């Protein structure tokens, strides 16, 4: 399944821990609605240190039932799909609502609204058929059919999935949408392939021999790069493939990747380069060092896209054992980004906590890679015990599995605020999206998972704590 991310405001009014997290420490459970939003917007449905994908999927089903408000669930799914671009989780919610909600007029329009691309129809049907089998509810068929009828020939051809287990034509035959020229051509087998850069590469891969395939792909990549036909994010995602299959265009590739104007107009953030960096480290490709240098430069250019935050900021990065792997990589790069872009202070914490100074001459990526991880446990209390000045906000980057000394640092946080006479806002990132909270006070927010909109939402919460909840509630859902 795809990855999901974002953050939510913390439930208020809790005065004592009321749940136990995966390591047995104290934590605070969100209300069912807030926990649902948290899980819907989290990126990590892949196996995590404490939870597997299957467990997370089951948790979603439980929360949908626990919330007991199908319209809220539907609004949250629409918000996740259209505001944050989350795909697989919206398919799951649509399938679950199709099974559990009967006789409601709004459901047909919801199923039509949840579809943003033609393959959303196929994924939603695939989920329902895999979990519940036939028959498919009429409201789901009618809603998805109405969505299919919106797409033109190019869109239908692009997502037809001719070689997939469940094809576009299978979806059309199942839901019987209103006939359109594009869908009629699809059913008759007369729809021409969409001409995209993906199909150009697919056509190159259909050559008869391995040698011809390699030559065709090299030519295809070369034409795409030299002709500047790839958007910046597509160039970033495919950098390693381009280097491997068309090394002769490495100069053009590096020039486009490091182009300051392209980076800034794409609004890409530093942490969005992480996958490209990790992919480039695989193998021993000629020219990889040059591309890595270009990525280093591009990451520094992308600091201009990071919003500023008024006042002082402390970034507290968890360096405990369970952070190893992707949470460590994304946490380090995000921490270095905030330090470089906003002048934030940096603290590492595990069994204890200490301030760390990054070399200002290092690039953002080099600075992130220089941050030492020392393993140990996760002592959230140490952050507030070691903080030596008043901060307007403290950003905590962790997998949220606090267990040292009971886990929840309620009293140390209160003592810190009293010591410096400050009302600090806490933004606590759960990099693995486990759905438990560490703090019960106002001005404290659990941010579950990750997304490329994280700075936008962080800024929104910093200005207006109830913004996200209101946004979900205000999503239009027609009867």
What does each of the following model-derived ranges do?
Residues 1-326, 342-479:
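Long lumenal/extracellular ectodomains of secretory and single-pass membrane proteins
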Residues 328-332:
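Short, conserved loop/turn and helix-capping segments at secondary-structure boundaries
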